[in-house]
């Protein structure tokens, strides 16, 4: 299992379940670094004090709230840890609700909750089975990374999953995005429903649900590593054009979906062809000799002062 992100407890009425929080997902994206193109030297970001114009270490860095342009209120990590919040040390379950009552827009990253030792095993299993039988999810509050957060607990196989959630006031109203003055015929809606039926799947298994972008990136990197030109873009069956007749486009889409199933009507539905952009050929570049550059002195800014006692201004919720 991955490393522990946070340790605490689930508070479930008078029941406490000690847990470890671990990541539930993995990122397989290809990661690039930034390089100076002239000599391929690695470009790095360093932390500088704008008043002293020098690089500072992590031990010299702390948090502060900018009250005004020239006044900063320092906030210590110890002060944040001692905030009088029950959620600072535990995931406090506030309510149980049907999953359908939660807007998916507010559901974020998922984490596995792992019982902390044999003592926590029984109450952990109790909560997991109770959630499963009730067909509900738990809504909880917890404090991470300098702010109180909303979370959702649900069952996934034999584990309890914590999903980070957004507060209701953090979700924007989409009403202004809806097109105005548009009318649809019943035939158009029926054709769209037929297309949905033809493209309906029981799961996300299949070649069309693989990460082809990452696969293509690996092909480019491997080709350049061997001194070859990057592979050419594969030819597509056709390129989609502008939709001039919505009804005709819907009928054509339904026909293609039917054809992709085969004569029996039971074959898998494949994704319609997408337009692909051709990869540019680039010559293999030899790294140049790394050279060091002198740092240019920065203009000395106006000095900020730490506030001693000022009229408090209510800060916004931190990110």
Swiss-Prot record:
Is the keyword DNA damage in the record? yes
* GO biological process, alphabetically ordered: DNA recombination; double-strand break repair via nonhomologous end joining
What is annotated about its quaternary structure and interactions?
Answer: Homodimer. Interacts with LigD.
Q: Which keywords are on file for this protein? A: DNA damage, DNA recombination, DNA repair, DNA-binding
Q: Name one Pfam family in it.
A: Ku
Q: What is this protein's function? A: With LigD forms a non-homologous end joining (NHEJ) DNA repair enzyme, which repairs dsDNA breaks with reduced fidelity. Binds linear dsDNA with 5'- and 3'- overhangs but not closed circular dsDNA nor ssDNA. Recruits and stimulates the ligase activity of LigD.
The name on file for this protein is Non-homologous end joining protein Ku
Methyltransferase: present as a keyword of the record?
Answer: no
- Quote the biased-composition stretches of kind Basic and acidic residues, using this chain's numbering: 260-274
Q: Give the family from UniProt.
A: Belongs to the prokaryotic Ku family.
One example of the protein's molecular function in GO is: double-stranded DNA binding
- Which InterPro entries does this entry report, sorted A to Z? Ku70/Ku80_beta-barrel_dom, Prok_Ku, SPOC-like_C_dom_sf
Per its UniProt entry, which superkingdom is the organism in?
A: Bacteria
Biased segments, Basic residues type: 305-319
Region Disordered: what ranges?
252-319
**Ku domain spans which residues?**
10-188
Disulfide bonding pattern of the chain:
none
């Amino acid at each position: 299992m991955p490393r522990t992100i946070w340790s605490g407890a689930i508070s479930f009425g008078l029941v406490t379940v000690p847990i470890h929080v671990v990541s539930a997902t993995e990122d397989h994206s290809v990661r690039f670094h930034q390089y100076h193109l002239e000599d391929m030297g690695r470009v790095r970001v360093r932390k500088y004090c704008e008043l002293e114009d020098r690089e500072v270490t992590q031990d010299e860095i702390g948090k502060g709230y900018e009250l005004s342009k020239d006044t900063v209120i320092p906030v210590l990590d110890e002060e944040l840890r001692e905030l009088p919040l029950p959620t600072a040390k535990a995931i406090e379950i506030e309510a149980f609700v049907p999953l359908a009552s939660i807007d998916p827009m507010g559901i974020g990253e998922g984490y596995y909750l792992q019982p902390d030792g044999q003592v926590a095993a029984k109450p952990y299993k109790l909560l997991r089975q109770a959630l499963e039988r009730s067909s509900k999810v738990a809504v909880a509050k917890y404090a991470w990374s300098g702010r109180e957060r909303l979370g959702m607990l649900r069952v996934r196989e034999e584990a309890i999953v914590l999903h980070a959630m957004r507060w209701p006031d953090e979700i924007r109203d989409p009403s202004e995005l809806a097109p105005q003055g548009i009318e649809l015929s019943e035939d158009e809606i029926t054709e769209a429903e037929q297309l949905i039926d033809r493209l309906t799947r029981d799961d996300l298994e299949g070649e069309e649900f693989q990460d082809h972008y990452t696969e293509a990136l690996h092909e480019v990197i491997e080709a350049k590593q061997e001194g070859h030109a990057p592979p050419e873009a594969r030819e597509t069956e056709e390129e989609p054009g502008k939709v001039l007749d919505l009804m005709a486009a819907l009928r054509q889409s339904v026909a293609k979906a039917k054809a992709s199933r085969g004569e029996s009507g039971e074959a898998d539905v494949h994704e319609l062809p997408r337009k692909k952009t051709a990869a540019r050929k680039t010559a293999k570049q030899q790294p140049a000799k790394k050279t060091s550059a002198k740092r240019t002195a920065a203009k000395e800014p106006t000095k900020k002062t730490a506030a001693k006692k000022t009229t408090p201004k209510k800060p916004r919720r931190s990110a």
